Amino acid sequence: MQLELLNEQGQATAKVDAPDTVFARDYNESLIHQIVVAYQANARQGTRAQKDREQVHHSTKKPFRQKGTGRARAGMTSSPLWRGGGRIFPNSPDENFTQKVNKKMYRAGMASIFSQLAREGRLAVIDSITLDAPKTKLLAAKLKAMNLDHVLVIADEVDENLFLASRNLANVLVVEPRYADPLSLVFYKKILVTKAAIDKLQEMFA
């Protein structure tokens, strides 16, 4: 597979050979869906909590006598059948949403995403991306010159200048290959990869 090599003006100046094992795999929609959903599920935190009938603070006194009232029998007001009572199946902050994806499937899914991005023309290569100072406007100017406004940059090494400059750009994410995730790959309109990062991606996902 050959990918376009962009200059600092966003023009394709040459072609770069990329490993077919990562950038020319068959499109596997179900596997991609699985690893994206698993990534989102594993990022979830237990932020919901409700009380069951044991946890609500109600009297345990029987609200009315068992027989003779014509009403349905009731033992306590904390019953889930009563207004203000506990939930039958309450949400718990200890709930585990983890979904396991084995390494072989994850590598295959990531390679399938990279391959589809290459086929759609959303993946491009640049020699390197460096900044002289940690200034957001410097990085914004570089990306604007390449006509990139919604982009994931995968650099072989993210130095402090590049990291600090990218933090304040809403639609720009700069990561090293080891931090590339399936959700970001499918979310961003354009993926910009440095030449040195291609070798690292091959080691990880081939």
UniProtKB/Swiss-Prot annotation:
Described function: One of the primary rRNA binding proteins, this protein initially binds near the 5'-end of the 23S rRNA. It is important during the early stages of 50S assembly. It makes multiple contacts with different domains of the 23S rRNA in the assembled 50S subunit and ribosome. Forms part of the polypeptide exit tunnel.
Assembly and binders: Part of the 50S ribosomal subunit.
Keyword Magnesium attributed: no
UniProt-listed GO biological process terms: translation
Gene source species: Leptothrix cholodnii (strain ATCC 51168 / LMG 8142 / SP-6) (Leptothrix discophora (strain SP-6))
GO terms of molecular function: rRNA binding; structural constituent of ribosome
Protein's name in the database: Large ribosomal subunit protein uL4
Similarity comment text for this entry: Belongs to the universal ribosomal protein uL4 family.
Regions annotated as coiled coil: none
GO cellular component: ribonucleoprotein complex; ribosome
Stretches for region Disordered: 46-77
